[in-house]
């Protein structure tokens, strides 16, 4: 087979990394049951971290980052998958310790591979990617705990981020009233277009004085940032409400007491998209292809780039300069 292209991150000096598009062969890929011709990948915050010397993502260099990929099977030793099958690969060790999706071909264990559900294209799957998948997991967790639109307002922290944007849009699509919080100035129109009914500042979810129990404001909440905002949401969620958490950009420490749990019956639901069990993973993708699908939003939130554009886009991502989703076309 002829050579194909992939984006490599390398580290020659302890505090310095470099990005370069190189040509490699299939034999250069790691072991796995399924070989896939990648059509699309995406950009997540974790992908940006993987390019940094101090990002604490990549341990061995040179390495191909990219935690998302969607494409078509070209070879499989697992009978569950055959040549020509459209598939999705996200999470697990892809783009972390296993060559990732910024490559025209990947080879992965079959247990990482999810069949593309009916109603979704490969392009659409990567517009969602890990960010959309995590948001969908969060919304589904609320629903599993009985959340319904008539319950009242649902708060979303970090709403202009990848997960927060999708969470806002999916909740709105399902009929929930969304209060979106963001630290980025001038994003009110963007959040309103996603479906937010109310937009508040980051500071609104980070009061100087944090009370163990504050005035009940939200029926439920999706926290994407951790730290103080999560503590605040626990103290302001109404009796019996649920709060999901999936990020820590605002801090990994949580300041709370038992009061929200034993006096208001609050449910704190952890969301882990990396090692989500396979049956649940398929269920979430089914929802993304059906009732969670955002047909009217997918194109306007998406900027399509090529492998050649990736280095600049990844740097922009780390600096917080990306709004919406960057889709990487590899076909």
Predicted segments — roles?
Residues 165-173:
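Surface-exposed amphipathic alpha-helices with a cationic face
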Residues 172-228:
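Adenosine-nucleotide cofactor-binding segment
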């Amino acid at each position: 087979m002829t050579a194909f292209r992939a984006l490599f991150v390398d580290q020659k000096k302890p505090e310095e990394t470099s990005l370069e598009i190189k040509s490699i062969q299939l034999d250069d890929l790691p072991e796995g049951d399924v070989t896939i011709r990648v059509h699309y990948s995406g950009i997540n915050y974790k992908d940006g971290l993987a390019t940094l010397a101090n990002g604490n993502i990549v341990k061995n260099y040179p390495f191909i980052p990219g935690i998302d990929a969607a494409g078509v099977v070209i070879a499989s030793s697992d009978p569950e998958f055959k040549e020509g099958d459209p598939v999705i690969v996200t999470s697990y060790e892809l783009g972390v310790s296993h060559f990732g999706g910024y490559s025209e071909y990947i080879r992965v264990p079959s247990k990482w591979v999810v069949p593309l559900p009916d109603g979704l294209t490969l392009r659409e799957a990567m517009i969602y990617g890990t960010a959309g998948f995590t948001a969908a997991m969060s919304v589904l967790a609320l629903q599993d705990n009985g959340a319904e639109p008539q319950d009242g307002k649902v708060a979303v922290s970090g709403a202009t981020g990848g997960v927060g944007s999708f969470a806002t849009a999916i909740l709105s699509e399902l009929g929930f009233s969304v209060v979106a919080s963001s630290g980025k100035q001038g994003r009110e129109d963007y959040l309103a277009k996603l479906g937010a009914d109310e937009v508040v500042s980051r500071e609104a979810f980070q009061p100087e004085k944090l009370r163990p129990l504050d005035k009940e404001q939200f029926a439920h909440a999706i926290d994407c940032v951790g730290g103080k905002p999560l503590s605040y949401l626990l103290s302001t969620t109404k009796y019996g409400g649920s709060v999901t958490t999936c990020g820590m950009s605002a801090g990994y420490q949580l300041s709370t007491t038992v009061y929200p749990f034993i006096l208001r019956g609050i449910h704190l639901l952890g969301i882990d998209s990396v090692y989500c069990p396979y049956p649940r993973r398929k269920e979430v993708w089914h929802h993304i292809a059906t009732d969670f699908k955002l047909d009217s939003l997918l194109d306007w939130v998406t900027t399509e780039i090529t492998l050649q554009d990736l280095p600049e886009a990844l740097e922009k991502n780390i600096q917080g300069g990306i709004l919406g989703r960057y889709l990487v076309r590899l076909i």
